[in-house]
């Protein structure tokens, strides 16, 4: 397994709409393992394939307290939403930034597992929010898109300064 490089805002590749996975191959399964390792290495609770510059509809999530229950969602679709919720979200692709994002309180999801078998589940609380956040990535959308233009601009400027500093050192 390998830790993958996570793209950071404002990288245009994060705006790519992911394509469906046609066939779950051994290469896709290895890539999923790398995504899970990357998510844990970055101390995240979710990671979409687009965040690591692979533009297919794959998401990994682990909101468990023990950090040992990864969920794999291939070609996920939210089939139903209800209620209103929202928390101050962060993102591995927007390091150091947080913002309040409105989300549905409950979602129903259908996806394929890592072996290509279809399954469905209902989610609420943090899992529902995380699913919505990661599926946004598959559509080329980031949590900063929900923020005011001024806050988004400030976050972008801050991350660009950090990037320039890191490139010099």
UniProtKB/Swiss-Prot annotation:
> Which major enzyme category is it?
hydrolase
Q: Where on the tree of life does the source sit, at the highest rank?
A: Bacteria
What does the note under cofactor report? Binds 1 Fe(2+) ion.
Q: Which residues form the active site?
A: 134
SUPFAM superfamilies in alphabetical order: Peptide deformylase
Catalytic activity, EC: 3.5.1.88
**A Gene Ontology BP annotation from the UniProt entry:** co-translational protein modification
Which reactions are catalysed by this chain? N-terminal N-formyl-L-methionyl-[peptide] + H2O = N-terminal L-methionyl-[peptide] + formate
Q: Which InterPro entries match?
A: Peptide_deformylase, Peptide_deformylase_sf
Origin organism is Aliivibrio salmonicida (strain LFI1238) (Vibrio salmonicida (strain LFI1238))
Please describe what this protein does.
Removes the formyl group from the N-terminal Met of newly synthesized proteins. Requires at least a dipeptide for an efficient rate of reaction. N-terminal L-methionine is a prerequisite for activity but the enzyme has broad specificity at other positions.
Tell me the keywords, alphabetical order. Hydrolase, Iron, Metal-binding, Protein biosynthesis
Binding residue positions for Fe cation: 91, 133, 137
Cofactor(s) needed: Fe(2+)
Q: Which GO terms describe its molecular function?
A: metal ion binding; peptide deformylase activity
Q: Which family does it belong to?
A: Belongs to the polypeptide deformylase family.
Q: What is this protein called?
A: Peptide deformylase
């Amino acid at each position: 397994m390998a830790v993958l490089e996570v793209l950071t805002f404002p990288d245009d590749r994060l705006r790519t709409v992911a394509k469906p996975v046609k066939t779950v191959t051994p290469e896709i399964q290895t890539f999923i393992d790398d995504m899970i390792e990357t998510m844990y290495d970055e101390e995240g609770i979710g990671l979409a394939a687009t965040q690591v510059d692979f533009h297919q509809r794959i998401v990994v999530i682990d909101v468990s307290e023990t950090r040992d229950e990864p969920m794999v969602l291939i070609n996920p679709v939210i089939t139903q939403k209800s209620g209103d919720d929202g928390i101050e979200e962060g993102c591995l692709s927007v390091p150091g930034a947080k913002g309040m994002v409105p989300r549905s309180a409950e979602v129903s999801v259908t996806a394929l597992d890592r072996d290509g078998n279809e399954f469905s589940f209902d989610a609420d609380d943090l899992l529902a929010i995380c699913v919505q956040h990661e599926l946004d990535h598959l559509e080329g959308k980031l949590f900063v898109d929900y923020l005011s233009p001024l806050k988004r601009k400030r976050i972008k400027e801050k991350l660009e300064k950090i990037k320039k500093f890191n490139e010099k050192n």
